Amino acid sequence: HRNVVFKDGGDKACQVRPFSAMDSEDVEDLWAFLARYERRTDGQVLAIGHNGNLSWGRMFSLTDYNYDPITADYAQRRARWEPLYEITQYKGDSETHPAISPNDEFADFERWGRKFTEGEDREEFEEEKRGEYVRAALLRGLEQEVKLGENPFKFGVVGATDSHTSLTAASEDQFLGKMPTNAPSPFRVSDLGAAKFAASGRTAVWAESNTREGIFDALSRKETYATTGPRISLRFFGGWSYEQDDAFRSDLSGVGYAKGVPMGGELSLAAKGQVPSFLIQAQKDPLGANLDRVQVVKGWYSRSGEQHERVYDVVVSDGREIPSDGSRVAPVGNTVNIADATYTNTIGDGELSVVWQDPDFD
């Protein structure tokens, strides 16, 4: 399903009857409803796709509701009305899956979706996962842009809890489960499925003002990111002229906007021989654990029609060095005491900043 967000107040939103699955299960009918709303009220609205890690490959399918191949018109409308997608929530994240990111040691974090089972067709299983997870969807979008002239999966990401209890806790110390039966009670132990859920899902928005309008505008331009719970502060800019010293400027965000575009933006075309640079800063949750590293995941669609993915460590903590061959750094360590569910901040860093260039840019 989709979550629908209105920029406007009740004076406009109440002019239409809410659209639901009782009206239609075809997402194109929802898009038509959103278009009618904007024409009728001169308001603004957008839809956010629900975490699709249990969608059996349908969330990012290359066919429509009737199983016909998607068209350029379909792709254009999906990108128009669904600029964001929910990448994480209580039932796990939908960034990627070990089956389709086998070289990413973190790909199995808080995994809910089923794993490959013996006797199953591996190619069919992997194709199903590509229709459920974000990284694969972004690559599919690049492929469809070549084939259709439009990219249906050109979205930013958000996080949410998807709580079914009205208690939207994203922190472990406040987590009471996803369903009413997960809450503390004499019957809680009978719901063994509750162990699969995890506190998760925050959306961070770089808005110009803390108002409904300001937040909606930031959502629309995709200047957002998601975390699995920690209140990590992240800045990410792309440009052609960032310098290493920019990563340590007190006005880092000002430099970021002046020299490039923020997360969700589009870089201008490169001049011949130019290599893009990325200005990145991550700060830990003030009440949370230190940071191990910052990674950049690169996906590209080759001239031969193949999809590729590579994960880069771009800055790491505790004075460690990234090997010149690009191989990844071992984890910083682990101070977790499983017996009492505590940790100490004796390893890692509170802030990591870098200007990074892709050493393999073509």
Predicted features by range, described:
Residues 1-7:
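Hydrophobic or amphipathic alpha-helical targeting/insertion segments
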Residues 12, 35-45, 51-65, 70-362:
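C-terminal functional module detector
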Residues 20-27, 104-110:
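Conserved, charged catalytic cores of large soluble enzymes
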Residues 24-28, 132-135:
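Conserved phosphate-coordination/catalytic loops
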Residues 25-30, 67-69:
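Well-ordered, non-membrane alpha-helical segments in soluble/globular domains
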